[in-house]
Amino acid sequence: MNGRRKLNMQQNKRLITISMLSAIAFVLTFIKFPIPFLPPYLTLDFSDVPSLLATFTFGPVAGIIVALVKNLLNYLFSMGDPVGPFANFLAGASFLLTAYAIYKNKRSTKSLITGLIIATIVMTIVLSILNYFVLLPLYGMIFNLADIANNLKVIIVSGIIPFNIIKGIVISIVFILLYRRLANFLKRI
């Protein structure tokens, strides 16, 4: 019975930690920074960092849960734009799954950095394709913006690609700075 109680306690602590990371990620969605020379609707926030912390501490399912909860809460509180949270979830999921897949085989600083670089590239490609075929046409349809459909290539090349590269680099740097300091603490909670 004592072993079962200890296992339940560990599972509860893990669930609480994932919940806290989800809450932190949600709060971070409200702290946004515009990137000069890019369209004003493309703003940078650090809400993917808690998802990455959850992924690299507890595994990819935990990271996906944090990203999903963050974006569901963001949608429920913004009550308007379903496309933004959906795109953010896809960006975060493609980023964290790629980074973790590369890192998990050889857990080293080099594989971590390599994983984050490749994750930035994958996220940029995934979001460029999704924006071209799904997200931007959906925005155009929902908000009745005909200009979007006529300028997809320009929007992708001059906005989406540079934004996702910058986002991947910034998120990676912040994550690297925090991960080494917080990983052991998060595992002990």
Swiss-Prot record:
Intracellular or extracellular location(s): Cell membrane
Protein name, as recorded: Riboflavin transporter RibU
Residue stretches spanning the membrane: 10-29, 59-78, 83-104, 108-132, 160-182
Gene behind this protein: ribU
Family: Belongs to the prokaryotic riboflavin transporter (P-RFT) (TC 2.A.87) family.
Gene Ontology MF terms: riboflavin transmembrane transporter activity
Purpose of the protein: Mediates riboflavin uptake, may also transport FMN and roseoflavin. Probably a riboflavin-binding protein that interacts with the energy-coupling factor (ECF) ABC-transporter complex. Unlike classic ABC transporters this ECF transporter provides the energy necessary to transport a number of different substrates. The substrates themselves are bound by transmembrane, not extracytoplasmic soluble proteins.
Gene3D superfamilies in UniProt: 1.10.1760.20
Ranges lying in the membrane without crossing it: 45-56
KW DNA damage (keyword) present: no
InterPro entries: ECF_trnsprt_substrate-spec, RibU
Residue intervals annotated with topology Periplasmic: 30-44, 79-82, 133-159
Cellular compartments per GO CC: plasma membrane
The organism of origin for this protein: Staphylococcus aureus (strain TCH60)
Record topological domains on the Cytoplasmic side: 1-9, 57-58, 105-107, 183-189
Self-association state and partner proteins as the record states: Forms a stable energy-coupling factor (ECF) transporter complex composed of a membrane-embedded substrate-binding protein (S component), 2 ATP-binding proteins (A component) and 2 transmembrane proteins (T component). May be able to interact with more than 1 S component at a time.
This protein's UniProt keywords: Cell membrane, Membrane, Transmembrane, Transmembrane helix, Transport
Location (main, coarse): membrane
Pfam family, one: ECF_trnsprt
